[in-house]
Amino acid sequence: MTDTEKIENCDVAIIGSGPSGLAAATLLKQSGIQQVVVLERESEAGGIPRHCGHPPFGIREFQRVLTGPKYAKKIVETAQNAGVNITLKTTVTMLGTGGKLSIVSPEGAKVLIAKRILLATGTRETPRSARMVPGSRALGICTTGALQSMVYLKNQIPFRRPVVIGTEIVSFSALLTCRNAGIKPVAMLEEKRRPHVRWPIYELTRWFGVPLLLQTGIVNILGNERVEAVQISNENGKVREIVCDGVLFTGQYTPESSLVRVSHLEFDPETNSPVVDEFGRCSDPTYYAAGNVVQASRNQAKVPIFYTAENFPNPVDDAGQCWSQGRTTAKNIAKDLSGSLP
């Protein structure tokens, strides 16, 4: 901490404004906690649902079927109506002992000291760089999240005929986004012998006229300024070229836990998550974690109905499950602050 940094205090600080973070913040305010602050690094609150322009969201929370943006707007409004202070364009740079958070915002650097802190930073897809896919760095390469952000928030079309990599549930969300934007994928690739999702979800490829190539992986990306083609390899090692103008990497979710990894909190390298107890409490009892930043091991995770046990990918919860987890953890935090949590 430097002499120029301001020091502020609150009862509970929540890092992340997705379903888990906002659900927790709302319940804490409704439980009588006075100063609840949500810290969000982006310019809008609501998390991933903000750029998922399709249903179904909100059934568990509001008993209504909503699109992602409408759901995000509703959970933000619910939190604000409860009196939650949502601070945007605010990045936490360090998790300290004693409830100290180092923060940077357009107003400058400061230290926020909270009685309790909830980590609700969520999860992210694995990008091209982490998948070690060689080839051109041309324009037209992105993840589902980036695509949906461009289409639904910025009204931009990054490509017209991409190759889609992966067959997780989010991969088919990507297909829906492509259809809504007038994008026509030329193929969907899956390295395993079966899609990750169950029938009839993978039938979307047939209904949308997208060839589903199983036991096939991407081995190279070709192009100069823009993607022009990809080289793919099948189970026999045969390599061929597909003409396309983009590559869409989907799924392979990993917790957004970079803050935890470099902090004093105990970290599980197997799941890339903070270690928590049955109350969602971290190794430093000032800290809690909820939502997709806490990933169960594959042996402990329940297989969702839309996945096969054989091809179950990294466990990830939907918005409704994260909302529920946020509320449960918030109840534990409220009990902790009152001295009634074991």
Regions found by a protein language model. Give the residues of each.
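Residues forming the flavin
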Residues: 2-342
